[in-house]
């Protein structure tokens, strides 16, 4: 029988969670990781090979170590089981035995990527020295410091180079890899750079080596295997005289408790305790208290806020028992704060300071078993819980889910409550409605035993109204005293509904409670003054209205009953009206009932529509406190009636009565619409406040992007961060004209593009996803190229739908000289953009430019070049687009054009063929006078553009061939006050420059002389004629080249039999030489094109345009008249 052969161990390619310790005496000065035998064999499968191994390591337990770092790995058989040792001279010299982190994640690395580009920064003196050495010598110095060969230097972004006092500030395509001679190495000066976390440039956290650490006591004793140790009867703290310690209060996030303490590594003795009683402190605080991590302490609160010198009676202070845990070192938390959850702080009044004292009975014999909470807090025998009235708790479709979540909340742990405490329970409203529609709506009363957790998006509130205790002969609960709810002993009764508003202590907001439960984030709409302009003024206006309305309603001395009705309107969709209302409701703790008019509308019956509204709203308005009733798309319920019909609008009448009824009961009624003019006059008159919401301005877009890009994660919880070279200012400028919803789409699309980019890199380098992600620190990093691609995709896909303007790609080089014209344009456009402060004191801006002259002289292209040169968005408006058969709609179209431009500023509005848009008033034959009204509206909008407020960043450019037909009012100062004549080139040198600009991408024959070609052209050629000349010359060259190739093919086929003759395609695929496909434009091609070209403007017509010019510029000097058209025809496209 053959012997058994042991199968080789397959390497484990997934991340491994294991124990870590810091080497206290690294003697070689190098950074690497030692793996014990079990870990090494698990991830690599072979202990006998001598290959150089690498791992990516992330330390767990401290916010200072949030990224993976790449290390060389070695085998160390003497290490304890399932553990590794980190050799880091920098961390060891700073922390030594104070380093208390115990857990890490190890990602095995099968291949380290070679870096294509690395940027290093050095001090000024070192920079000058490095300039004199070669790249090879620099690599040798770095390799010597790293203990590796010059061809494979392991380098990480933010690494500090001790020998040269330099720093690695950028790496591509990933943040960590091999630096070699093939790497593009860029050296910069270190001026203005700041080191952050792990040396991160401009980071938000300090370097871990710079964080002061206090000497900790044993942070957790339950998992150290000390159960067999015994002490004598004398407590280890018996000789300490411990006084109450005064601490400030900090907010505790649930993730902070799980990630930054050792509670998960401890025993399961805390699994059933209420995590709302868990507090976190720095280890130095535990030492002062004489406590271990996990001990019970007593906090005392006082409302006077006098601190340690408080003169209040100590017996009057409220005493509360909590359990305290130590934060792992190193960390950047405040050592003078006690971190508690905002839910618990709200229940005790959110004191500014507390007095913390160790319980005297804690560990009396020095044992290592934490005392139980039941020894200090009594168990309640019965508890009565009432629902707090809200649109959620009053909704029958959500009843089963929020009661199920309430039951789970109390059964999962032994909760600690006090009388009159308010308890929030997260609920997924989408899941609740789905369960109701699946079971109850179909008549099935049986509910599923196991309910999915879902993704909570709202809070259902409950209140402890009454109860009895097991002791004291079943007396009622005492206010302010703690009680434990033991599911096995306590009887819980859910009964009644209370209409109270959930009270919050000073310093705690409803938004902080949402953040604690990790509910969907809401944009805060900050009101900031940026460049002398307030951001989100409409949000501030809505805040003031809602605040005053609730304050008057809550004022018991006020006899007035204010009926508050607000209309939110916008010209664009998806600008965030509903998001704004939700945020304002959250800020004020109001009960928001949000309805969609299209869901309520019944076209066949007004009574059924009103009945549906009442069925959803009556109980909420009657039972809840601080109600906001919000109806979206209110124009669907209150359309403006046809004036030709005599039928009364009963829907509007009934809706108006409903609005009066609800507002008289104290509710705030808010409606929103995208077309305020479509609402009936009756309902429109009911709204006392009309707030217009515009597309976000550039500062507002930056704030929105900042919020969207903060703390991003993918669906699998992978962190997403910005690369340091991403500029939010640039993104805000590039996203001009886009709404908040569009920005959300752009960010999501950018993340998708970044993931696809990394997936392509993973396939190309044959590295799995986990390893590649660890090379970027375990994060997906968004680059400027990702955002540029996403924004361009958004504009290409949705430009027609959202009316988003684009920045054209026409440069000054495409247009040509125009020195005088450029100077005029710089004075008009560049000055307000670069120095807006000059116009902040009422000075009017000259924002109108009029190009006129013969057709084909590049007026349109010049306008596009303005937009490109100054990075402005570009709106092109044709005259017929503004005309509409309905009275008032043409003027409204003009208003919409200028409003879109204001939304997309900085922006250029270009009116092509302006004489068709704004002809002289009184000369038109239309019976309705629509053209006259368009001119009047255009004049009013132009005046608004030149004003100091609202028109900044919007420039108007017009083009016409007939300025004599324009209304004279358009040409006065402040409107189109800059008139620039674009004529034809009057010298052969200028014509040669035109041809040179047009042919700069051509392949010209060496014998071609553009000056001689220009000398053969008449002075009646416009820019469009020269474009036609060059295009025809290229076409002639292509025809000539094709003929020559056809001749070669015929000659080749002459000596071949009929069946062996080749085709043109075969010739180009197999036989043709490079010169056969090269198109060279020769002088004969230009000559032929010139002979066939007919000038677009005759000499008589040019004379007419010159006479028109003299009429408009008669007061100008002859020199200016001749310099304006210089080079005006240097274009590459028709007008």
Swiss-Prot record:
GO CC field: cytosol; peroxisomal membrane
Membrane-spanning intervals of the chain: none
InterPro entries associated with the record: AAA+_ATPase, AAA_ATPase_domain, ATPase_AAA_core, ATPase_AAA_CS, P-loop_NTPase, PEX6_4th_dom, RecA-like_PEX6_r2
Coiled coil: none
EC number of the protein: 3.6.4.-
Membrane topology: Peripheral membrane protein
Annotated ATP binding sites: 853-860
Recorded superkingdom: Eukaryota
Pfam family for this entry, one: AAA
Any GO molecular function: ATP binding
Any GO BP annotation: protein import into peroxisome matrix
Cellular compartments annotated: Cytoplasm, Cytosol; Peroxisome membrane
Keywords: ATP-binding, Cytoplasm, Hydrolase, Membrane, Nucleotide-binding, Peroxisome, Peroxisome biogenesis
Major enzyme class: hydrolase
Function of the molecule: Component of the PEX1-PEX6 AAA ATPase complex, a protein dislocase complex that mediates the ATP-dependent extraction of the PEX5 receptor from peroxisomal membranes, an essential step for PEX5 recycling. Specifically recognizes PEX5 monoubiquitinated at 'Cys-6', and pulls it out of the peroxisome lumen through the PEX2-PEX10-PEX12 retrotranslocation channel. Extraction by the PEX1-PEX6 AAA ATPase complex is accompanied by unfolding of the TPR repeats and release of bound cargo from PEX5.
Subunit structure: Interacts with PEX1; forming the PEX1-PEX6 AAA ATPase complex, which is composed of a heterohexamer formed by a trimer of PEX1-PEX6 dimers.
Family classification: Belongs to the AAA ATPase family.
Name of the protein described by the UniProt record: Peroxisomal ATPase PEX6
